[in-house]
A protein has these predicted regions:
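Conserved P-loop NTPase
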Residues: 2-5, 9-10, 93-94, 98, ...
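Pre-Walker A adenine-sensing motif
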Residues: 15-26, 256-266
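Walker A/P-loop NTP-binding active-site region of P-loop NTPases
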Residues: 25-91, 262-324
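P-loop NTPase motor core
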Residues: 33, 106-187, 191, 342-426, ...
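Conserved inter-motif catalytic segment of the P-loop NTP-binding fold
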Residues: 59-143, 299-379
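Conserved nucleotide-binding/hydrolysis micro-motifs of P-loop NTPases
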Residues: 67-71, 79, 93-98, 140-142, ...
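Flexible loop/N-cap segments at domain edges
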Residues: 254, 259-280, 285-287, 331-338, ...
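Terminal-proximal interaction/regulatory segments of ATP-powered molecular machines
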Residues: 285, 291, 302-305, 327, ...
Length: 507
């Protein structure tokens, strides 16, 4: 999306980085905008951030409120740690209470001949302060005062004409339950919709949509956001086409020669690899091996774990001598536990994007099963993942994804959702039985960027190391899920149990 042709518009930044990115820099100045949303969706928080950003830029602001008292607004600001110096709060509830019972109508004729006392307070405050930014909170209370839809719309139209002549950028806040009020939406220069839903389990999910802004291009669709201490944090929907970049080809080796041989030399930057297999077969350990190898080569890695704590993830790798704790302390890697009940897919994509912008060149998602639970439906998982992988590929990032399959042995082993077509490399891990012992096998079934071995190798996670054995050609049933080994004991990796020669014991 090209925003260069719209650079001539002066913008009023909102103070919310993600929202300004969506709007291409902020709202065009000297216009009126409608912000719709349910109670608790964050409209007041957005309005305060909008005015505070103006103060930071040396502009004055007015907050005209009918829905909350001045003290309530100051309490909200204190909760976020915001000083309100430079913002004039116009408490219209006080003005309303001073009116007589027979003057509870807010008639504001376009000719500006007759004004209600409530509206006159706003006009007087604006003329006295001469602000660059104005917030009116909210239209729902004004609608009640007007009592008549025609008077109400005439009043909004007159306010629009007045504020346009006053060179103010105005936000009108309104509840989002007034469906079909297209006349109000048409009167404003832009419309911003806030939505929130409560899933069956977990925190509320919030998203926003720019319904319209006249004269500019903006990033369409829904964008996730959260309300945190410090204000709204918006995660723009990730669009890979907005971040074009040609990555330099390079291979990241695992540090295990046998594994690199299996993969035809290693995994390339700008590609994605899926580690597929049943629970406990070594997928996370294999992913940790690539993190350790990349960090040792001076590359920064970012790990997102959905299924276990960072402490356990790092601890397992430490016991295998990978040295991840040292890499973590040296800022060569980061690890974050993701709770799919709390973090939306858009927020997750935004977190990954920030890590990449800060230099991450290897990203691990462990696991896609947890990522899937963050999606309301399967098709959304595929769309989100497609866009995320396309973005990471353009940035030259190696993406390693873990997916656990259901079942342990035989034909019952299957994936909860087929995502293999999205990835460049698919590594299959399986259990097999040989000589009365359960062992693990690793093979590569897909590699887009080059050739790879067709054989199965043994994978062993034991003691203080991860090891990959030589080719085992005496296998059949790899793709059916019923992996059967028909060879002798000598090609297998030695185990560390018992005394003497373990291999001799097998024979």
């Amino acid at each position: 999306m090209n925003h260069d042709e719209f650079k001539g518009f002066e913008r009023a930044a909102t103070g919310i980085e993600g929202l300004d990115y969506i709007l291409g820099g902020g709202f065009p100045v000297h216009r009126m905008y409608l912000v719709e949303g349910d109670p608790g969706a964050g409209k007041t928080t957005l309005a305060m951030q909008f005015l505070l950003e103006g103060v930071r830029r040396g502009e004055t602001g007015v907050y005209a409120t009918l829905s909350e008292t001045e003290e309530e607004l100051r309490d909200i600001a204190r909760a976020h740690g915001w000083p309100l110096e430079g913002i004039t709060i116009c408490d219209l509830q006080t003005a309303e209470e001073s009116l007589k019972a027979d003057s509870q109508y807010t008639l504001f004729h376009p000719s500006e001949v007759e004004l209600s006392e409530t509206t006159k307070v706003v006009i007087d405050t604006v003329e006295r302060v001469n602000p660059a930014r104005v917030v009116f909170d909210s239209l729902s209370e004004m609608r009640l005062l007007a009592r008549d839809s025609l008077r109400y719309r005439r009043q909004i139209l007159a306010l629009k004409h007045y504020f346009t002549g006053s060179c103010c950028t105005v936000l009108l806040l309104d509840y989002g339950n007034n469906q079909g009020d297209f006349q109000l939406q048409s009167l404003t220069h832009g419309v911003l919709n806030f939505e929130q839903t409560t899933p069956g389990y977990g925190a509320q999910r919030r998203r926003l949509r720019v319904q319209k802004v006249r004269g500019i291009s903006y990033r369409q669709g829904y964008h996730d956001y959260v309300i945190d201490t410090g204000g709204l944090k918006v995660s723009p929907r990730l669009v890979a086409a907005d971040h074009p970049q040609v990555a330099t080809p390079a291979v990241i080796e695992s540090g295990l020669p046998e594994l690199d041989a299996l993969l035809g030399g290693g995994l390339e930057r700008g590609t994605s690899a899926m580690l597929l297999g049943p629970s406990g077969v070594g997928k996370s350990t294999l992913a940790a091996q690539y993190v350790a190898a990349a960090a040792a080569q001076g590359e920064k890695a970012a790990v997102y774990t959905f299924d276990e704590s960072p402490h356990l993830w790092i601890g397992r790798a430490q016991r295998l001598g990978m040295g991840l704790r040292e890499h973590l302390d040296a800022d060569r890697m980061s690890i974050r536990q993701v709770d799919p009940a709390e973090l939306s897919p858009g927020d997750f994509a935004g977190a990954v994007r920030r890590e990449v912008e800060e230099g991450a060149r290897v990203v691990v998602i462990d696991s896609l099963n947890g990522y899937q639970h963050a999606m309301p439906e399967e098709r959304y998982l595929i769309l989100h993942l497609h866009e995320l992988l396309a973005y990471l590929s353009q940035q030259g990032v190696l993406t390693v994804m873990v997916m656990a399959q259901t079942g342990i042995l035989g034909e019952v082993v299957q994936s909860p959702v087929d995502l293999s077509y999205l990835t460049d490399t698919v590594v299959l891990l399986r259990y097999f039985e040989a000589f009365g012992e359960v062992r693990k096998a690793i093979s590569v079934v897909k590699r887009r960027t080059g050739d790879h071995e067709r054989y199965v190798r043994e994978l062993r996670v034991e003691g203080n190391r991860l090891s990959v054995g030589r080719e085992l050609r005496e296998f059949h049933g790899v793709l059916s899920g019923q992996l059967t080994y028909t060879g002798g004991a000598s090609p297998l990796l030695r185990n560390s149990h018992g005394g003497g020669d373990p291999e001799a014991g097998l024979e």
